[in-house]
């Protein structure tokens, strides 16, 4: 989940709650503990599952084609990139919206590309989907139009497609700065305060712990992940 989704809010439509059936758990270390011997025996199962998922990807409603009025460009995207595309282009261009990107639907992508003159992959950061499409023998554009650094935006999509960027609106007043800090009452604050006083070199981990690196605690020197 990308930051723009995780740190956002919007109006949603709710449906009736669906209770999945309870499934009994059976202990099976050979299945759930992937020590080398078990991992070798389970690897064929993983490959079989991926093949089944590849078939599922072709028909699942998670991956869908949305028609457009101008087939000169076909856009392939997923996640927030899809929302940027729809807000920037509306229903002008056909869109292949991928809700499942591994395994990717090969036949669906090829059929979509056959119906448009030019295929553009819109995705943030590395060109994962673009590389897959190129591997299928398609002439696609992606990172030649979009940066592999930072976030996308509606205007970034517009500029890449030769459209006029939308005008922005500046705030009349500056928003008060709110630097990241651990929440009041967080028990980690006391720990990091003590580590700071001891002047230790501390290797942290992902999550809220990273906030221990900023002032006034300044207690973490590195993180293992993220």
Each model region followed by its residue ranges:
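Flexible, low-complexity linker and terminal segments
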Residues: 1-182, 187-191, 196-200
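Thiamine diphosphate
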Residues: 192, 201-226
